Amino acid sequence: MTHQPRTTSILSFWTNKLLLIAFLSFSFGLSNCIAQQNNWLHFTPEKAQAKGKKVVLISGDEEYRSEESLPMLAKILTQKHGFETFVLFAINPETKQIDPEYQKNIPGLENLQNADLMIIASRFRELPDEQMKHVDNFLKAGKPVIGLRTATHAFNFPKESKSAYKHYGFSNQEGDWKGGFGGFILGETWINHHGDHGTEGSLGLMNGLQINAKNPILLGVEDIWVPSDVYGIKNSLKNSEILVFGQPTLGMTAESPINRKKSIMPVAWTKDYQIPGGKKGKVFTTTMGSSIDLLDKNLRRLIVNASYWAVGLENEIKADSNVDPVGEFKPIMFGFGTHVKGKYPKDYL
């Protein structure tokens, strides 16, 4: 009998601990499920860590699996760096499932109204005006933008389109918006594959001039290797700061030698933008950024550092900050038609 109170006490202790864990898990899940009902994810940092900055990450590409990479980046930004994040997806309105091949619907863009940063990795989207207006208003306000990989050709409107935002299309050649969103805002539109797509990777080489100038975005970043190939660039980027050059590699592994027959191309840069009637804003663009590319720690650090820089927190960038994925991250190889079918936003919590 003398041992029963101790046993009861231990059982009570662990029961209370389990109830607390269950409650916290339920509370965290509930906040995200509420967001998921509207087809996007919403992550909030702990109060002690919060930066007071909101970031909207926009996926929606058919090939490079941004529906995998952006939730991972959002969790790093929230749990490791104190940013509040929203992750948006291409959603099929009939199934309510994530469908990168459905090009006309990305719910949740209204979250840009009070966001501090937009990170976009979309490809060839033809969004309705009621969604595009939120992107346009964000840019008119001169707020910062980070473009990843296919964001250079994020939008595509056919010639017969009646959209008020047709000029965002990657092939536009009219007025100020030559090259559309990519050409006018990010610095380049879609040109070509400079490297051999699917057989050559990219070695990202730091620009020594920018390192010498102590560019905060490059703090702690070393050479990057990714399996996606180098994109071609035609724009001189004369008003940009080139941070990283990409050299094609003869193979799809980090040990592959460089292809000395091919020139280097800019693969990461910063610049300013200003749309007609809008305020001036700043941009970080990298043509790297498939989901499998983000297995490279240095690329993750580059993007996290760029996020700090974009929202004016460059003085808080640390060379050894934690940029490890939160939980398991097992991206699949890029390719058309390879996305995992039947997924909902909540599946990427």
Range-by-range predicted roles:
Residues 36-50, 68-69, 79-80, 250-349:
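Extracellular ligand-binding/catalytic regions of CAZymes and related secreted enzymes
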Residues 1-15:
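N-terminal secretory signal peptides that target proteins for export/translocation
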Residues 88, 245, 286:
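Hydrophobic residues at beta-strand termini and immediately following loops
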Residues 50-51, 113-114, 141, 213, ...:
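Residue-level preference for short coil/turn positions at secondary-structure junctions
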Residues 51-52, 148-255, 319-349:
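An acidic, glycine-rich "communication" segment
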Residues 17-31:
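Bacterial N-terminal signal peptides
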